[in-house]
Amino acid sequence: EIGNIPDRICRALAASAGLPSGTPGPVHINCEFRDPLVPEDSQSESACEAVEGKRRAGVSVYPMHFLRDPLSENILDPERATVVIAGQGAEEAVLEWAARSRVPVFAEPMVCGVPEDVRIPFQQTLLDDEEITGLFEQIIVTGRPTLSRPVQAVCASGKRVVVVASYGEWPDLHGSASCVVPSLQESDCVDEARQLPLLEALRERVKEVRAGIEERIASYGDTPSALGVMDIVWQLCPRIFLGASNPVRIADLIAHRHENASGPTQVWSNRGLAGIDGNTSTALGWASACARLEGADYSAVTAVMGDLTFLHDASGLGLPRGEEFPPLRVIVLDDSGGSIFESLEHGRTAPVEMYERYFGVSQRADISALGAAYGVKTRTISSLTQLREILTSPVEGLEILHLPISRPTKDIAHLRSL
């Protein structure tokens, strides 16, 4: 408990000083003191020494406008092989710095524009491999990489963590950050002699995983599967919305499996406690905003979500009279209920009947009839060939593509174990 004290109060103290945003704010800290409230003089020194010996050093937070002398201070430890872990909201300047410095980047699927030379795909698989995580000792975090457990585990593994964030609520779920800076400077450098072997080792591992993914997708032939559908969407669709359940995690497992392929230009997914709430409405709102801003140059949004996610916000399909749907395709991966918990402790330990009742909750809804009730064109897709043909044709208004599939639980477990 004593060791957690710096992590608990560090954010509050940083906010009171305006770090790293530059805007100080009021802070309220609730503290409870143990009896005796005033220790005897003879106890003071030993008590302080006990706390000092047990506590973990607090994080150093640098203000936004703090100018570091490039000759005297390097935030990074150049003696440590370094990687970047980029989550949703990653700062472009950090990705550009990584490309210049030959620092590998593990990125969530919502992070687009990572330079090909340093992008390392399949982060869930690679960062769950101790041989891989043993190759580097320093992590630079940008954005909010909270999608998968392997990423969080490596950030909490005792490696040196540098967070780049210009806002007060910087990402550091485990209190493991060594320092927080609003940006990286040219003086922040790493040792290229350490980085190049790391980059090459990661690329070799990526080749192995890529082959395993290709084999797994090919095993389904032309039959739609969660992996096969996501693979096609990633190849063909420039703007993708991912449902906040299995789809975003499957994208994290297979995105960029095609070497030297550019992939989508924009990817979005709702994050945080909202879960599957409002995914259909969010996709429609994003598509509508993009269509209004871009006009004739609009690149349609393709949304991919599970059946429960779709049904949970089905009323989002409602549209007032006199308004038109934006060009949007909603791909519904119908695996008869919720399957994300099958790959977690719930599915591994609960009896099948209990799991299906409380987590699977397969619905009796007719998705085609539901779409028709809202005046939305709905098609049931039975092959990947058919899906590919549709995705390469123009979309007019809102369209629902209903794909019955098997649950991807075993596929997800297989890809994570490659």
State what each model feature region is.
Residues 28-59, 161-200:
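Terminal amphipathic helices with adjacent charged low-complexity linkers/tails
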Residues 31-37, 88-90, 110, 168, ...:
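Glycine-rich beta-alpha junction loops
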Residues 203-298:
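Active-site diphosphate/adenylate-binding microenvironment
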Residues 1, 119-128, 164, 176-195, ...:
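Short acidic-hydrophobic, aromatic-tinged amphipathic segments that line or gate anion-handling sites
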Residues 255-418:
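Thiamine diphosphate
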